[in-house]
Amino acid sequence: MVRLPLQCLLWGCLLTPVHPEQATACKGNQYLSGSHCCDLCPPGKKLVNDCTGITETECSPCGAGEFLDTWNRESRCHQHKYCDPNLGLQVQGTGTSTTDATCICHEGQHCSSDACESCILHSPCAPGLGVKQLATGVSDTVCEPCPVGFFSKVSSALEKCHPWTSCDTKGLVELQAGTNKTDAVCGFRNRMRALVVIPITMGVLFAVLLLSACIRKVAKEPENKALHRKVGWQDPVETVYPDDFPGPHSIAPVQETLHGCQPVTQEDGKESRISVQERQ
């Protein structure tokens, strides 16, 4: 084995080229551009030009309706989210240069997905089911079956199951048991039913008779007033014939009338006429 002199080894080391290692680690808010660590653009601004050995990173603000919410080296800003009313959305928060706009669903609707790009109506709970958890803007209604002793007879996204009516607490008897869709039916006992129905029936009949009597009385009042008015306008007229008195008398009848409560006798030889009624 040939041994090289120590001097050759030393010269070999000196002649070996030494290449400087490039810097690859930059600070948290920097990025590597070529051989330089450049500063990232702050939220609300986008990158225009990278830094150089003599210039800093050049950034510009986002335009109207745009935003960037992180430190970045983006050349374009993001557009604000559009809350489309045709999809059931409305604006919850207006976007800025550093935050996006937020949307929520109209009342009675919730987001169809986690991204909330559209809304759908809350699901109602069918009869026999009650609401366990109300729907929110991001979640649908949660329903549960009505347990024994409870019922729900409507389709609703708001109502819970209702308890059956307690007939005992009302002093009644249960005529029909409740189900998960119908309430219990209560009623009177046979004797109690008679005690309640008879007074009610008598009261109704009495009211009908009283009303009928009042109607008749009111209907007769105009007739009575008209009759009294007609009698008051006429003067009493009385005709007296000669045959009513004994003794001789002339052949021609003598007519006597009462006029103003004074007797008036027709003269002999004049034609007998019935007096004309005079009115005051």
From Swiss-Prot:
Signal sequence annotation: 1-20
Cytoplasmic side stretches: 216-280
Chain ranges on the Extracellular side, renumbered to this chain: 21-194
Compartments it resides in: Membrane
Spans traversing the lipid bilayer: 195-215
Alphabetized GO MF terms: signaling receptor activity
A Pfam family that the UniProt record links to this protein: TNFR_c6
Glycosylation site list: 180
Annotated TNFR-Cys repeat ranges: 25-60, 61-103, 104-144, 145-187
Membrane topology: Single-pass type I membrane protein
Keywords assigned by UniProt, alphabetized: Disulfide bond, Glycoprotein, Immunity, Membrane, Receptor, Repeat, Signal, Transmembrane, Transmembrane helix
GO biological process, one term: B cell activation
GO CC annotations on file: CD40 receptor complex; external side of plasma membrane
PANTHER family referenced in this protein's UniProt entry, alphabetically: TUMOR NECROSIS FACTOR RECEPTOR SUPERFAMILY MEMBER 5
Assembly with partners or alone: Monomer and homodimer. Interacts with TRAF1, TRAF2, TRAF3, TRAF5 and TRAF6. Interacts with TRAF6 and MAP3K8; the interaction is required for ERK activation.
Task performed by this protein: Receptor for TNFSF5/CD40LG. Transduces TRAF6- and MAP3K8-mediated signals that activate ERK in macrophages and B cells, leading to induction of immunoglobulin secretion.
Protein name (Swiss-Prot/TrEMBL): Tumor necrosis factor receptor superfamily member 5
